[in-house]
Regions:
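Extracellular, repeat-based ectodomains that mediate carbohydrate processing or recognition
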Residues: 1-169
C-alpha cells in the first residue's frame, strides 16, 4: 500500500489468526489457528467462493480468560468441504492456550448441527468459568443481505452456546 494514494487493499484469501501481548516485546506474533483443512490434503483447495464480510477466511475473533489464566478464542472460519454449491459456510471454532499464548490447542468446531449453517459474529463472555459462554448469529445461507453478494433478507437466529471447558482437555 502507498499511504498517500488514498486507496486501500483487501486480501480475502488470507487465513489465520495471530496473537501478541506486551510480554512478547519485539517478538513476532504467534499463529493461533485458521480454517481447518477438512479433507486433509494439506491445502484449502475446496473453497468455491468466500462470502464477503470484509474479512479473511478465518476472522471475527473474541476472547475470554479463566481463573487460571487460560485464554480461549472463538472465531468464524470458512469450512472447506461445506458448501451450498456457490459459497462455503462458516462455522464457529474455539481454541485455548494455558501458557500465555505461546501454544494453542487444535481448534474445536463448536457449531451444533450438520455444519451447513452460516455462523458468524461470535461474542464470548470475558470471564470463563466451567463453561465458555458465547452468542453468535446463524442463518442457512452463506453471505449477507446488506453487502457483498446481497443475499435475500431472511430471519437470522442469535444462538447461545455454553461449552464445558473440559471439552478442551
Amino acid at each position: 500500500d502507498t499511504p498517500s494514494d488514498g486507496g486501500w487493499s483487501f486480501f480475502p484469501g488470507t487465513n489465520g489468526l495471530m496473537y501478541w501481548n506486551e510480554s512478547y516485546g519485539s517478538e513476532e506474533p504467534v499463529f493461533i489457528a485458521g480454517a481447518p483443512d477438512m479433507d486433509n490434503d494439506g491445502t484449502l483447495n475446496s473453497i468455491t467462493e468466500i462470502a464477503y464480510y470484509g474479512s479473511s477466511i478465518s476472522s471475527h475473533p473474541s476472547m475470554g480468560v479463566d481463573a487460571n489464566g487460560c485464554i480461549y478464542v472463538s472465531y468464524s472460519s470458512v469450512m472447506e468441504t461445506l458448501s451450498n454449491g456457490t459459497q462455503n459456510y462458516r462455522n464457529i471454532l474455539v481454541t485455548k492456550s494455558c501458557d500465555g499464548g505461546c501454544s494453542w490447542t487444535e481448534p474445536l468446531n463448536v457449531t451444533p448441527g450438520t455444519g451447513f449453517e452460516e455462523c458468524q459474529f461470535a461474542s464470548m463472555a470475558d470471564l470463563v468459568d466451567n463453561n465458555i459462554n458465547l452468542v453468535y448469529q446463524r442463518d442457512f445461507e452463506p453471505g449477507m443481505a446488506v453487502q457483498g453478494d446481497n443475499d435475500a433478507y431472511v430471519m437470522n437466529d442469535i444462538i447461545h452456546l455454553s461449552i464445558p471447558v473440559t471439552d478442551f482437555d
